[in-house]
Amino acid sequence: MDLPGPIHDFLLVFLGFGLLVGGLGVVLLPNPIFSAFSLGFVLVCISLFYILSNSHFVAAAQLLIYVGAINVLIIFAVMFMNDSEYSTDFTLWTVGDGITSLVCTTLLFSLISTILDTSWYRVIWTTRLNQILEQDLISNSQQIGIHLSTDFFLPFELISIILLVALIGAISVARQ
C-alpha cells in the first residue's frame, strides 16, 4: 500500500507487536484451542505484512491457504482431541521447558549474530539485477517467482518453518 511514512511505520510496529503477542500466545497458552486461534492471528498479521509490502497476491494466498485451510484444519483436529489432560495437569514450568527455552534462545541469538555479520551488498546487488530483469518479464507468475525468491524470501521461509514446527507438534500430540 502506498501510505504516508508515519502511518506505514505505525502499521509495521503495530503488526510486529501483534506478531509477538500472537506468537507468545501460541507457545504459552495451555489450551490448544486458544493456541490455534493465536496461530490464526499470527498468520493474519503476516498476510497484512504482505499487503503493506504491495504483494497482494501473496497476501491473498496466505489468507486462503494458511488461515482458511490449514489453521481451520488444526482447530478442527484439536477440537476432536480429549482436552481433559490440559485442564487438570498443567504445570507452569518443567525441566523440558527449560531445555527447550535454552535451545531456542541460543538459536535466536545465533541467527541474530549471523544476520548482523552477513554482507548484504551481494544480496542488494542481486535484487537490483532482478529489478532490471523484471522489466523484461511478460507474465505475472514469473514476477511472483522472482519476488518470492528475492524480496519475500525471508517471510516465505519463516512461514515454512512455522508450518514444520506445527506439524511436528501435531505429530507429537497425536502420539501421546
UniProtKB/Swiss-Prot annotation:
Protein EC: 7.1.1.-
GO cellular component, one term: chloroplast thylakoid membrane
Transmembrane segments: 10-30, 32-52, 61-81, 92-112, 152-172
Alphabetically ordered keywords of this record: Chloroplast, Membrane, NAD, NADP, Plastid, Plastoquinone, Quinone, Thylakoid, Translocase, Transmembrane, Transmembrane helix, Transport
Keyword Plastid in annotation: yes
Leader peptide range in chain numbering: none
Name of the protein described by the UniProt record: NAD(P)H-quinone oxidoreductase subunit 6, chloroplastic
Source organism (scientific name): Draba nemorosa
Gene: ndhG
